[in-house]
Amino acid sequence: MFTFNQYSVSFFTNIRKLTFLALLASFAAFLPGCDNQRIAQLEEGVSTEGDVRIKFGEPEKIWDGANGAKIFEYNRQPAGTQNYMITIGTDGKMSALRQVLTPQNFAKIAPGMMMEDVRKMLGKPMKITPYELVNEYHYQWRFMDGANESDKKIFTVVFNTDLKVKSTGSAMDPALSPNGPN
């Protein structure tokens, strides 16, 4: 007769966690291919808001854009490396589709910028970590800084307690470390 003890329960818990992580990783790897296909089927100035919603689903958030436009946020964090902002003009047509997690956009983040402005620019972060002892909040986004898997990085924006940017930086994705993430 087989009995469970703390070691067998721990073993089965670890197996479940590993299975879940493997499924999550395979799903995340599949998303960029799906996005590329969806993007190819949409055309700026022609595709409608309805076309965008059919291809991408409901947006994570809808931001107010210039001149009455709406900006749909499509988040691919935490496992993905892209966030998309799709602009719908007042005529109901898609006027822009942009992958926003780029070094060019990161360079626009400046000290004193408000958190909401950063969110409008980059989309929802993969992780928010409060550091209460130093009165900081670290917002992090995973992104690709090249074409290879080894080019995955983490972009961090450090905010003060007023949610104004203090500093920014990029580092290698800890998930790529031989020792795994922290």
What do the PLM-derived regions correspond to, one by one?
Residues 34-182:
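Residues within mature, well-folded domains
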